[in-house]
Amino acid sequence: MENEATVPAGREASMTETNETRRYLVTGRVQGVGFRWFVEHAAVQLGLAGWVRNRADGRVEVLASGPRQKLHDLYVELKKGPRASRVDNVEVEDAAPETNLKSFRIEGTW
């Protein structure tokens, strides 16, 4: 685990909201441009839990859990990316929930 950020007070998902989990695969110029830090910041601001990591194939993988609207908001941010990046595609799929997700963290290359 390289870095871990906790969800700011007041940004936690409401216990009455149903959380969903999504896996995103981001393709383009997304490594070496601060993309993981960009994703971590966006996810924490949205109150999401999960992780982001570089993949050996050049893509960035994101697993995020939270309310459906917040996951959509993250998707919008992923399509933008940080200034130095170029996002060509964002694949999205439902993922099995991971019960140990309490915060959002940056992981190493996988």
Curated annotation (Swiss-Prot):
Its source organism is Koribacter versatilis (strain Ellin345)
Please tell me which top-level EC class this enzyme sits in: hydrolase
Molecular function GO terms recorded: acylphosphatase activity
User: What is the protein name given in its UniProt record?
Assistant: Acylphosphatase
Q: Name one Pfam family in it.
A: Acylphosphatase
The record's Gene3D superfamilies line, in alphabetical order, gives:
3.30.70.100
Q: Which gene encodes it?
A: acyP
Please give the family membership noted in the entry: Belongs to the acylphosphatase family.
Annotated keywords = Hydrolase
Looking up InterPro entries in the UniProt record yields:
Acylphosphatase, Acylphosphatase-like_dom, Acylphosphatase-like_dom_sf, Acylphosphatase_CS
Q: What positions constitute the catalytic site?
A: R36, N54
Domain Acylphosphatase-like residue range list = 21-108
